[in-house]
Amino acid sequence: MLLQKFSEGMTNKDLQLLDSLLHEEMLFLQDTILETKEQWVKDMEIQFEKGTFDASKIDVITKFETKEMGALEIIIKEGDTLLRLSSVFLYKDDKIYRQLVKYSS
C-alpha cells in the first residue's frame, strides 16, 4: 500500500516516486512546522542532495495501515542517541493527504 511505497521512496531517495504518492493538497505538520506538498518535496530534495538524510541510520516500522490512514514508527540512530518519531498519514483519493509527525527521545 502507500506506506511501503513511501518507505521505498525515502530509502531510495526517489523524489519522483514520493511526489507521485502525494495528494495535490498534501500538508506536512511537525510541531510548529507546516509545509505544502511543494515545500515538502523541495525540502526533501535539499536533504537528499546535501546528504543530511541517511536511510542507513533509520529503522522504519509500519504500525498499521487502512484504506484511509496509516502510521509509521521511525527510529533514527545519531551516534549513541536514538530519536524516535511517530508519523501518521491520512489519505485522500488514494494519495497521502496529510502527514503528522511527532518526535520524542
Which stretches of residues belong to each language-model region?
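Absolute protein N-terminus
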Residues: 1-2, 105
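Residue-level detector of alpha-helix boundaries and kinks
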Residues: 2-3, 25, 29
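Amphipathic alpha-helical repeat scaffolds
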Residues: 4-8
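Conserved short acidic donor-positioning loop in nucleotide-sugar-dependent glycosyltransferases
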Residues: 10-13, 32
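Short, well-ordered alpha-helical segments enriched in acidic and aromatic residues
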Residues: 12-25
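A beta-strand edge to alpha-helix "cap/lid" segment located at domain peripheries
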Residues: 28-29, 35, 41-105
